């Protein structure tokens, strides 16, 4: 019993010291921690914007129109939602490495590769969820919008506006996935300090090195991002 209490005390002290050092690193703006945060926010923000710009029109086409290969394409899109991020990273690595078809562009281990990988992860989520929203839209509401004989662009924008509250959740889900992923960022980004190191890859590295405080500091930031994302989502839905 005494041994158990001692082990419990040691564990709690270890956790407490880790949190204390983590807060010290955050409040003192540790350079490596801030760099990982900046890289994460920059790459994820650009990739989610690109995914929305391309995903909304493609999702609209998939949900609005009827064509021969629709079921097959939906199957591919839905399958890609659960595709392992490590596998995506490996495929992308093969494409952009020096021996790959896109090797001449020198994308490997750059912020551009990081953005491309996150974009590939976010795009199927946007397409799949938006197409489902279009298909499940109230038929009377749908026919009313269609009766206005709008141009294709205006029709897409009108649909987006009408489904804006549901789309907030789509954006939050897609953004949450790319911010929290490790596989693609590690493989094609290379986890280079002050360049392509993200919050998640930094947590993995620091924990493996035994730098528990740095890992906790970055984990706290990741939790804060998730909290802010959900807070903004709930606020927008109420407006």
From Swiss-Prot:
Identification of the protein by name: Tungstate uptake system permease protein TupB
SUPFAM superfamilies: MetI-like
Free-text function comment from the UniProt entry: Part of an ABC transporter complex involved in ultra-high affinity tungstate uptake. Probably responsible for the translocation of the substrate across the membrane.
ABC transmembrane type-1 domain: residues covered: 37-233
UniProt xrefs under InterPro entries: ABC_perm_TupB-like (IPR049783), MetI-like (IPR000515), MetI-like_sf (IPR035906), TupB (IPR053776)
Gene Ontology annotations for the cellular component aspect, listed alphabetically: plasma membrane
Superkingdom, natural source: Bacteria
Pfam families (UniProt xref): BPD_transp_1 (PF00528)
PROSITE patterns linked: ABC_TM1
Gene name, Swiss-Prot/TrEMBL: tupB
Keyword set, alphabetical order: Cell inner membrane, Cell membrane, Membrane, Transmembrane, Transmembrane helix, Transport
């Amino acid at each position: 019993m005494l041994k158990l209490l001692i082990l419990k005390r040691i564990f709690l002290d270890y956790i407490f010291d880790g949190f204390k050092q983590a807060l010290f690193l955050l409040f003192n703006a540790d350079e490596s921690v801030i760099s990982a945060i900046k890289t994460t926010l920059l790459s994820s923000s650009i990739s989610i914007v690109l995914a929305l710009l391309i995903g909304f029109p493609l999702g609209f086409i998939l949900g609005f129109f009827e064509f021969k290969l629709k079921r097959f394409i939906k199957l591919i899109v839905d399958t890609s939602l659960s595709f392992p991020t490590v596998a995506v990273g490996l495929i992308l690595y093969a494409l952009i490495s020096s021996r790959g078809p896109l090797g001449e562009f020198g994308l490997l281990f750059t912020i551009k590769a990081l953005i491309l990988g996150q974009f590939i992860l976010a795009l199927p989520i946007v397409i799949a969820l938006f197409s489902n929203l279009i298909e499940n839209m109230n038929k009377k509401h749908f026919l009313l919008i269609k009766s206005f004989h709008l141009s294709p662009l205006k029709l897409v924008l009108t649909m987006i506006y009408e489904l804006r509250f549901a789309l907030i959740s789509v954006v939050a889900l897609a953004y949450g996935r790319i911010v929290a992923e490790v596989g693609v960022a590690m493989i094609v980004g290379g986890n280079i300090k002050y360049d392509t190191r993200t919050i998640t890859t930094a947590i993995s590295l620091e924990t493996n090195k035994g730098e528990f405080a740095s890992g906790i500091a970055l984990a706290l930031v990741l939790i804060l991002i998730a909290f802010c994302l959900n807070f903004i989502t709930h606020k927008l839905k109420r407006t």
